[in-house]
């Protein structure tokens, strides 16, 4: 965006999507039959007096994803399509600027979670069982809001409804991929054939948007976005997506998966973790510092092992950019043509026994320790890239990669500063593991007892 344009305040993109379904079907008929392609776009540019307009693009219902787009119909705006880096730059700058807030906000939010676990375990009516996932949803949502913007969503107008609104919106994004356990005859038409109507979730989206708009303004993130050439409105939608879908959606699955793996690994691993964590924290003067966390090699290995065995995002898609050959692990070459859609199911790739040996399907906490262990890291793919590589504005690797491995480690630190060991029942739910605490043994040594 040229600096001369910035002097005028950004305005909303004009246009209309019409009524759900009916609007898109009408537009499709215009596009294919009544107007033809060129006229379809030209007439809308004329109608709204703007070359950047909100319109539906065919095919729309019921075949394609959401038909609603912001269409860029002039030579100046169009090149934005070539450049996804502004949004990424914004996320890198956000994570970098909030680096120092992560440890204290993590600790305050998650120590409150564990206090709740303890009091609920002590209360007889709970039957000595405490569901971790529900507590994690509420805590992770608040933690992310506070870590990124300094404002806990539960203290705003959203109140305690943030996680449920976010989960509903997530379901609207992910329903083609999930099953709710209902009979197939109901689920197929409901979840897998059509997109759920967006007006049913628009109230939830608006409430979330309002939180992001206020919190990101207060924390000046939207000022940064503007200085990168993004409009405040566009930046806010992107922050909502990165925070709710990528970050909250990620932590909703990451922590139960990690806890499940560690619970099943048993007491021996628990005491090794507790010893390592407490020694490093004691050495740092009783404080959980980033430097202390860096020294915890076993902790890091356990987080990687969990991400290897149970990657939170299991499917990957990509178009072949050129005609290419793909080699399988059996040494077979396959021809793939430009434009073909490639699809990967990650759990298969990261449990390959030819890389991870006979224990490939097992949780081995210390797998990545030492020189030999480090050599395996390049086969850990959870971030849409190798664990030995780093995300940048030029690649499609998860920009939250380092943040995720850090919070995974902080989770174990909090757990084993507090407890010598714990027991839990492990099952599965919609998107990953379900964990129910059945008992915790308070720490008998180290800084956690202070
Ligand atoms: C456990 C947590 C997380 C997991 C498992 C995860 C995983 C992934 C994966 C697999 C992708 C690639 C998707 C694809 O193109 O196929 C991705 C992309 C992305 N992630 Fe994460 N992520 C997590 C947390 C985060 C966090 C905390 C952020 C916050 C900044 C984030 C931001 C993004 C963004 C913006 C992309 C799109 C990158 C691009 O297409 O260029 N993620 N993530």
Which residues does each predicted region cover?
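Conserved cytochrome P450 K-helix/beta-meander segment immediately N-terminal to the heme-binding cysteine loop
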Residues: 344-382, 387
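Cytochrome P450 proximal C-terminal region
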Residues: 388-450
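Cytochrome P450 catalytic-core helices
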Residues: 250-276, 399-419
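Cytochrome P450 heme-thiolate monooxygenase catalytic core
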Residues: 102-255
């Amino acid at each position: 965006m040229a600096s001369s344009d910035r002097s005028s305040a950004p305005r909303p993109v004009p246009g209309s999507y019409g009524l759900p379904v009916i609007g898109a079907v009408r537009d499709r008929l215009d596009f294919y039959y009544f107007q033809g392609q060129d006229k379809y776009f030209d007439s809308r540019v004329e109608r709204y007096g703007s070359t950047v307009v909100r319109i539906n693009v065919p095919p729309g219902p019921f075949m394609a994803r959401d038909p609603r787009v912001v269409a860029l119909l002039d030579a100046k705006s169009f090149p934005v399509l070539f450049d996804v880096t502004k949004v990424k730059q914004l996320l890198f700058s956000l994570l970098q600027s909030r680096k120092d807030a992560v440890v204290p906000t993590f600790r305050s939010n998650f120590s409150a979670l564990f206090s709740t676990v303890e009091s609920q375990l002590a209360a007889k009516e709970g039957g000595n069982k405490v569901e971790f996932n529900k507590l994690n949803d509420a805590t992770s949502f608040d933690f992310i809001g506070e870590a990124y913007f300094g404002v806990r969503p539960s203290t705003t107008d959203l109140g305690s409804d943030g996680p449920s609104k976010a989960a509903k919106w997530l379901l609207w994004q992910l329903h083609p991929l999930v099953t709710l356990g209902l009979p197939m005859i109901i689920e197929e038409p409901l979840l897998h054939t059509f997109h759920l109507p967006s007006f049913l979730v628009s109230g939830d989206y608006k409430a979330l948007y309002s939180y992001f708009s206020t919190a990101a303004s207060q924390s000046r993130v939207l000022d940064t976005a503007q200085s990168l050439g993004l409009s405040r409105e566009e930046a806010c939608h992107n922050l909502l997506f990165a925070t709710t879908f990528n970050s909250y959606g990620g932590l909703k699955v990451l922590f139960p998966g990690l806890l499940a793996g560690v619970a099943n690994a048993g007491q021996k691993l628990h005491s090794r973790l507790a010893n390592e964590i407490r020694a490093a924290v004691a050495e740092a003067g009783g404080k959980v510092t980033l430097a202390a966390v860096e020294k915890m090699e076993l902790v890091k290995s356990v987080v990687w092992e969990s991400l290897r065995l149970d990657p939170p995002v299991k499917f990957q898609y990509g178009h072949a950019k050129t005609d290419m050959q793909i080699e399988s692990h059996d040494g077979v070459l396959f021809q793939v043509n430009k434009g073909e859609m490639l699809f990967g199911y990650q759990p298969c790739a990261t449990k390959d026994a030819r890389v991870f040996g006979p224990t490939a399907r097992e949780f081995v906490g210390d797998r990545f320790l030492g020189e030999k262990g480090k050599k395996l890291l390049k086969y850990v793919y959870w971030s849409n890239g190798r664990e030995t590589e780093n995300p940048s504005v030029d690649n499609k690797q998860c920009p939250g990669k380092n943040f995720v491995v850090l919070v995974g480690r902080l989770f174990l630190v909090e757990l084993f500063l507090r407890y010598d060991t714990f027991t839990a029942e492990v099952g599965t739910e919609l998107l990953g593991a379900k964990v129910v605490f059945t008992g915790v043994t308070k720490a008998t040594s180290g800084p956690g007892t202070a």
